[in-house]
Amino acid sequence: MFQMAKRAFLSTTLTLGLLAGSALPFLPASAVYADPDTAVTNKQSFSTDVIYQVFTDRFLDGNPSNNPTGAAYDATCSNLKLYCGGDWQGLINKINDNYFSDLGVTALWISQPVENIFATINYSGVTNTAYHGYWARDFKKTNPYFGTMADFQNLITTAHAKGIKIVIDFAPNHTSPAMETDTSFAENGRLYDNGTLVGGYTNDTNGYFHHNGGSDFSSLENGIYKNLYDLADFNHNNATIDKYFKDAIKLWLDMGVDGIRVDAVKHMPLGWQKSWMSSIYAHKPVFTFGEWFLGSAASDADNTDFANKSGMSLLDFRFNSAVRNVFRDNTSNMYALDSMINSTATDYNQVNDQVTFIDNHDMDRFKTSAVNNRRLEQALAFTLTSRGVPAIYYGTEQYLTGNGDPDNRAKMPSFSKSTTAFNVISKLAPLRKSNPAIAYGSTQQRWINNDVYVYERKFGKSVAVVAVNRNLSTSASITGLSTSLPTGSYTDVLGGVLNGNNITSTNGSINNFTLAAGATAVWQYTTAETTPTIGHVGPVMGKPGNVVTIDGRGFGSTKGTVYFGTTAVTGAAITSWEDTQIKVTIPSVAAGNYAVKVAASGVNSNAYNNFTILTGDQVTVRFVVNNASTTLGQNLYLTGNVAELGNWSTGSTAIGPAFNQVIHQYPTWYYDVSVPAGKQLEFKFFKKNGSTITWESGSNHTFTTPASGTATVTVNWQ
């Protein structure tokens, strides 16, 4: 009862403090927020977090004794292809001096922590090293230049004590550069298991790697089953590789990491990744997001399909592209920004789980000499108040510049806490914990022209309204603005840092005002919810018996009922119930997609749709069909007797279109699928051209899946 009263007091205090312009919300997160949905212990949701992406080697050298020696190291960090000395002790030092807490970030996404190759590689006369962490050799050991296992554990413990989560980069797509015909090149892509050699790229008699040449990125299949540049590409249909990565990630989960960023998900089979995610969620579920690089593409159906079916979220490149076009490059306007918000909300089942960003290590930094600081500050404000989980690339708060690799990965230039960008982040980041409209809310455009965008975030009764004028020379007269803000006066949360103003609302109607040139303002209102309202369910996928976390507001302190579709879960199957968070065991129901609801004190919540219940433990099976000739316009698909195979549907839940170019060639087709372990499957292939379906004849094919590992089943078209 004391805890509930304490939370109610904090909620009221925070609301009044924000309206009065108080500095209270800008205390370190760990000092203020106690609700379980906002706590550092909530590994299943990052909705209330702001991520800070740091290249470990480029941030701070906290322990010079672990630096490389010889040609791999440049103490001046003037050669950005070499190691510069940054390590986990450097991160620990900045955690302890409150740099991150004062900035307002509550999660650190660090470079892949695993052991990388020690060899240097000469490309076109330039020495290259594995400073970036993406040239792994042993996924069960640490990169000694970052620190020891004890150092890594200390990093996690120190971060958690400050209310900061740790996200690791993880790259199960490949090891390191290799040449089939030259075992002396680099380390020949060799993979180790805690120091024991598993195998190398040359003479790969066990089939641990693909040997199909380099990808030309001409198709999804080409990118999956051919090498990414010269990197030794894993064959995930190999049972040894499958087990290796399911075991390796558990090692890091057991150390206490809070999240995973998966590299190059576009270049690995969806089926294997879904199976891998299922094993993670059955072990220790954490928020996981992948990198599906889109470049400047507006959208990609395969990208959307992956986000909705793999069990993980994605880095939101559509958001990134739109923000850069509008605020950085001036190639688009606010209507395009609003269109992106609307289209992604339609396409992604869980749009609030996608990770938003304005730049990262694989693209030119947002800031250049030609980009006004105010445009960067506005892009940050938009990202921090928009739907999705915001990620800030290290040095952005210091206006770090750099076009392309390696200049976009320069050494952290300073740790100033007085820049305007730092100030913007520090004022807006805490809103994700204090106002559920920012963490969980919907988005609605309220006023717009080419240069001005006013949008509203709303969750239950909580509201945030954001106004941005990207025109740096002309103010805008805002008239007829209608919002959900209750009657009252509202101060700019930014305190005028970006020339924002205060406003007055009369039943949601805002008095006419002038939005200054280059201005951004944020106004917000929070109040306690009296009815159950779901903001997030995580993970988004699981098997019966797994525990999932439901976050939101207004659940009350007395256990109610959780519904998966029409199946009610009560009693001991609900392992905890608090006003902002519920933990519940997935019931034994038929596999498929379900709407999750909460009933508290006789009142039903909103529905949280598209939660995926799996049949059970998952394995990856490669389905191969021979002699399936098609006509122009036809593609081949697979369906079968379990939800993971589409439950005999020929619609969007069917598997495919199948591939026929790399592992097997037309008229043989194949596809890797995550299916239930130890299960007798019945399945058929079918040809599809638009709405025209051509089924195989004869009886259903049958196959019993293994209890673990991987398998291949090959049939003839009948």
UniProtKB/Swiss-Prot annotation:
Record domain CBM20: where: 613-718
Stretches for region E: 615-718
Subunit structure: Monomer.
Segment forming the signal sequence: 1-34
Record-linked PROSITE patterns: CBM20, TAT
Catalytic residues (UniProt): 263 (nucleophile), 291 (proton donor)
Residue stretches making up the IPT/TIG domain: 532-612
Annotated GO biological process: carbohydrate metabolic process
Domain comment quoted from the record: May consist of two protein domains: the one in the N-terminal side cleaves the alpha-1,4-glucosidic bond in starch, and the other in the C-terminal side catalyzes other activities, including the reconstitution of an alpha-1,4-glucosidic linkage for cyclizing the maltooligosaccharide produced.
Descriptive protein name: Cyclomaltodextrin glucanotransferase
Annotated keywords: Calcium, Disulfide bond, Glycosyltransferase, Metal-binding, Secreted, Signal, Transferase
Binding site for substrate: 134-135, 174, 227-230, 261, 266-267, 361, 405, 409
